[in-house]
Amino acid sequence: MPGKVAKIGTFSDWVGMFDDWRKEIGVNHDEIANFKFDTLYGAIETEEIQFGAFKGRRKWDNLRQVPTQQMRDALINLIVYQGDTEFASVEQQRHLFESAPTDWDRKAITRVMIEEMRHGWQMCALLVEHFGYSGKVEAQKMLERRAFENKRLLGAFNVDVDNWMDFFTYTDFVDRDGKFQLQMLKYSAFAPLGRSMSYMLREEAFHMGTGNDGLRRIVEAGVIPAWLIQKYLNKWISSSYDLFGTDHSSSAHWAYVWGVKGRYDEPKNDKAPDLDDLNDYNRNLYHDEVAGLIERFNNSLKAGEPKLYAPHVKFNRAIGKWAGQKCHAQTGEPLDHRAYEEHVKDYMPSAEDKKLLLDIINNEKKWIAEKTGARDPLSTIGEVRKSAINL
């Protein structure tokens, strides 16, 4: 598809491109090919704008009601970035079906991919329906970029997810960043975007649960050493910190002023926002949630194993004020160049670490505890959708 000239006139045209995209990247298994993708809208808590300069006014139902072109541009940018991550994650994980540790896990990753595709579908439906020619162009480009060609918009979504330690850590923590982003968009003054979030959030909960439970099963099995698990936590959580955006972001500042993207805890937070520190505020909420989840894993560690932890927000950062800074993974303390080079070997996965991990996964049948008492993920995929407004 990349390089083709194809103009989208209607959403049906886009659906044809979506079908081609699935086939081209190799994720058109029967369960996926036979799934009925659709656009789902749920209820929003209030019809009034909840924050920013337009607080108290009625939320906007269409683009004509959005006051300025700058605000319309901000909305399309938010939707494009969100949609791009959804399709990227499918591309990142596309080779994992055959290596699933259990049949339940194979069905779980199938469901995760179906729902990520549906989230991308939802964002492209918004673009095509509400944003005219520009929206159609962006919806088309969404299916032309490729994670495995390093073309996705955010760096973490161009990294291969090619083993099940990566997958479980990714779905627990990168998808958890996704939860934060979706929740912030749920409060949007642009009502169609806010209504899109209800079912995306419910579906995202399954993805995070799959990752969190997968890591719990790995820790309980006690075959993969804790120091190796920690390296994968460091890899994906530090990438997730970057996904919250730069410090002192003018984009986040104006998105809040215009009412199109709130704080994660917006309805419960009655304090005046620091408009120049919004991304860091939400990032710190994420860190605290992640740290609590990891502490639970420690309850299942074998005696003598080192405790797991959330890496410091200064570690391994690629954007913001800590980008390129050489800081300790656990304490955040600054290190000199030579010390940091050695430190990274001990705290981030190396080629040798990956080889060890794959040796364990391929040769130790009990590297992960059995999944017990769980329903078939594909049999329950429609349950969160029963009350949706299906358009």
What are these model-predicted stretches?
Residues G120-M123, L127:
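Amphipathic alpha-helical
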Residues Q183-M184, G214, D359:
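Domain-scale activation on soluble regions of proteins
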Residues G3-V5, R72-Q82, P101-H119, F167, ...:
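Alpha-helical scaffold segments that form or flank carboxylate-/histidine-based iron centers
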Residues G132-G209, I229-V260:
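Active-site-proximal alpha-helical scaffolds that flank and shape metal-associated catalytic sites
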Residues I79, I109, F168, M197, ...:
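Hydrophobic packing residues in well-ordered alpha-helices of helical domains and bundles
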Residues G214-L233, I237:
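Solvent-exposed, charged amphipathic helical/linker segments at domain boundaries
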Residues L96-A100, L185-K186, I218:
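Secondary-structure edge/capping motif, primarily at the C-terminal ends of alpha-helices
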Residues M1-K107, E129-D162, F244-L391:
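Terminal targeting/low-complexity segments that flank the catalytic cores of oxidoreductases
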